[in-house]
A protein has these predicted regions:
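C-terminal extensions of enzymes
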Residues: 325-397
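Active-site beta->alpha loop and helix N-cap motifs at the rims of alpha/beta catalytic domains
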Residues: 61-64, 71-172
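Catalytic alpha/beta core domains of metabolic enzymes, predominantly
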Residues: 186-333
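Active-site-adjacent beta->alpha loops and helix N-cap segments on the catalytic face
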Residues: 143-149, 167-181, 194-205, 293, ...
Length: 397
């Protein structure tokens, strides 16, 4: 009998917690084959991965309960099968020789989202719209345009009822979340890094729900999650530089605790706010730290037991399954950050501000260095897709 995987052990601590696939479902089969080929015990790995997701499973038996994507992950789906997508794009060009690269980009982006959502639509239907959501992101280049993000969200959601719209944590993004919620469109607040953004999202969703209910909008297929990009807060911002400026030496464990402290606080805020009927979603996790020679995954261990969503990219899953397969979990999410560690972290302005509910105004969200870096990364991926399509167009000129 094959032993429970590390992911099954995590979910056993809190059965309401959800595991999502952080990539396009279109790349899952190729990734699965690579993982099995790399495994010391291919049979055990096959069983493990087929428990995560397999078309042959009854939908309710798959451990993966949803999907998150972004432009970079959508681009990866094209790179995973470039010959096919080149041909598909060429057919689009032939069908409409007047379409430019941006128009074909958007059509291609929607098609990859539609197919990915289709892989989880059976679960969405079997669970009566509780699980099986597919997060498709509005164009990150429009992150300061509430009108455009709202229109794109409505268009993307129209492709499949289980498509949830990822909207970034900018002031304009929260306005778009309010508008989409008022229409009954499910949302995922992405590029969220600090507690002020969590508060802003809860407020936007609560306002949108009030409007939706007043207008009699059908909310049976609606849902909200708030994504905290955990390690991006610790590694892309000013945590280490500001610590050095005031003479603090931060260990790898300290950095992980900083990220975990934010997630724990966000989970508590949701528990205390019944007007927000959504969940936190934990992303950007790391296999870390190593303590006394033992490899930990504190992003999972210290949050285990919380009723949240964990979204798991292929690279993290590979590290987890090969480096920490014997990890055990106990219910730790409500346990406080060690007081000496929290006191140390609160001396760092970057952390102290991120930890406070009023640390940032909505207009200041876009100034956060980790948000800026992440938004540029996602925007660059969108531009790369446009450039790929422009190359195909040049073949027809």
């Amino acid at each position: 009998m094959v032993r429970p995987s590390v992911l099954e052990k995590l979910q056993a601590v809190q059965p309401l917690a959800e595991l999502w696939w952080d990539s396009s479902p279109l790349v899952y089969d190729a990734w699965r084959r690579r993982m099995i080929a790399k495994a010391d015990d291919p049979r055990e790995m096959t069983v493990c991965l087929d428990r995560l997701f397999c078309d042959a499973n009854p939908p309710e038996q798959n451990l993966f309960r949803g999907v998150t994507t972004n432009p970079r992950l959508t681009l990866n789906a094209i790179k995973d099968n470039p010959a096919y997508w080149s041909g598909w794009i060429d057919d689009v060009i032939r069908a409409d020789r007047r379409a430019d690269a941006e128009a074909i980009f958007w059509k291609t982006y929607k098609e990859i989202a539609r197919r990915g959502a289709g892989a989880f639509l059976p679960q969405f239907e079997a669970s009566r719209r509780k699980y099986g959501f597919f997060s498709a992101q509005a164009d990150p280049r429009a992150r300061h345009d509430a009108d455009r993000m709202t229109a794109q969200g409505i268009e993307l959601h129209g492709l499949s009822p289980n498509i949830m719209i990822k909207i970034p944590g900018t002031a304009e993004g929260y306005e778009a979340i309010r508008r989409l919620t008022a229409r009954g469109v499910p949302t995922n607040n992405t590029v969220s890094l600090v507690i002020s953004q969590v508060v802003a999202c809860m407020e936007a969703v609560s306002l949108g729900l009030r409007e939706a209910r007043a207008a009699g909008v059908d909310l049976s297929g609606w849902r909200s999650v708030i994504t905290v990009m955990s390690s991006r807060f610790g590694t892309l911002g000013a945590l280490q530089p500001e610590a050095e400026e005031i003479g603090l030496d931060l260990s790898e464990s300290d950095v992980r605790w900083a990220e975990i402290a934010l997630m724990k606080r966000a989970c508590r805020l949701i528990e205390e706010n019944p007007a927000y009927p959504g969940k936190m979603l934990l992303s950007s996790m790391r296999v870390s730290p190593v303590v006394d020679g033992y490899t930990h995954v504190w992003h999972l261990e210290k949050i285990a037991g919380a009723d949240i969503v964990y979204t798991l990219p292929p690279s993290f899953l590979e590290s987890l399954l090969f480096q920490a397969p014997d990890l055990e979990f106990t219910n730790q999410w409500a346990e406080p950050v060690p007081p000496p560690v929290l006191e140390k972290l609160l001396r760092i302005p970057y952390f102290e501000r991120g930890y406070r509910e009023d640390g940032y105004s909505s207009g200041e969200f876009t100034s956060h260095p980790a948000l800026q870096t992440t938004a540029k990364e996602f925007s660059l991926a969108a531009r790369h897709m446009v450039e790929f399509i422009a190359e195909r167009l040049r073949l027809f000129s």
